[in-house]
């Protein structure tokens, strides 16, 4: 009988010199690309100004990355990053906080609504909320590959043992494993996919039958 799962996935897909190309970054990019295509299809269906969608992508990406990075730096290690502000720019070294990204998106959509669409923030969020679950699921799979954001210890057979000393392990040291823990990355990814499916259905219903603005955000 399986007692636990020993997770030894390498966070990096490959390296170019000293720079690693990581699964997390790939998952993040794929999530955004698929999300963009979903919103693009919604845009065409509703016959909206095509110039607005490219601006929405730019505002959303900037809000997500800047907010997530600042959230990590200021929420988790403010003393270090305030003393070394240039380190904040090193996004490629890792360190993104989802709650910071959420706040960044809200701020970005505020400016998008004021400067581009000239519609309410809820109108923009009504478009973004549909693929958000899918994007979030991809990011959580990236967290799984990074051996991070796992849950409490468990004796359930699907508990994961993650590598604690990733940097040393990458340099050739023997891996040091956590105790078997809940793979909360997978739990969250599954819940986000369910949320995505529900939002897709709600959008289809609201567009086909209700023709109402901001229906999803009101729900």
Stretch-by-stretch model annotation:
Residues 1-216:
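A feature for loop-to-transmembrane-helix boundaries and adjacent hydrophobic helices
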Residues 219:
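Cytosolic catalytic cores of cyclic-nucleotide second-messenger enzymes
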């Amino acid at each position: 009988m399986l007692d636990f799962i020993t997770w030894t996935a390498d966070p990096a897909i490959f390296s170019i010199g000293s720079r690693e190309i990581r699964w997390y970054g790939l998952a993040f990019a794929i999530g955004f690309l698929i999300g963009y295509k979903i919103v693009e299809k919604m845009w065409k269906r509703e016959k909206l100004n095509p110039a607005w969608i490219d601006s929405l992508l730019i505002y959303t990406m900037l809000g997500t990355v800047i907010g997530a990075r600042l959230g990590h730096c200021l929420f988790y290690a403010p003393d270090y990053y305030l003393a070394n502000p240039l380190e904040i720019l090193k996004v490629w070294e890792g360190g993104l906080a989802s709650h910071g990204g959420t706040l960044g998106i809200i701020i970005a959509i505020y400016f998008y609504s004021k400067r581009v669409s000239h519609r309410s923030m809820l109108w923009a969020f009504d478009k973004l909320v549909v693929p958000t679950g899918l994007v979030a699921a991809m990011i959580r799979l990236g967290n799984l590959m990074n051996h991070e954001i796992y849950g409490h210890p468990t004796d359930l057979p699907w508990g994961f043992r993650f590598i604690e000393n990733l940097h040393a392990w990458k340099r050739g040291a023997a891996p040091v494993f956590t105790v078997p823990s809940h793979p909360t990355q997978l739990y969250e990814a599954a819940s986000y996919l369910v949320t995505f499916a529900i939002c897709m259905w709600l959008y289809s219903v609201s567009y086909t039958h209700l023709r109402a603005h901001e229906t999803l955000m009101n729900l």
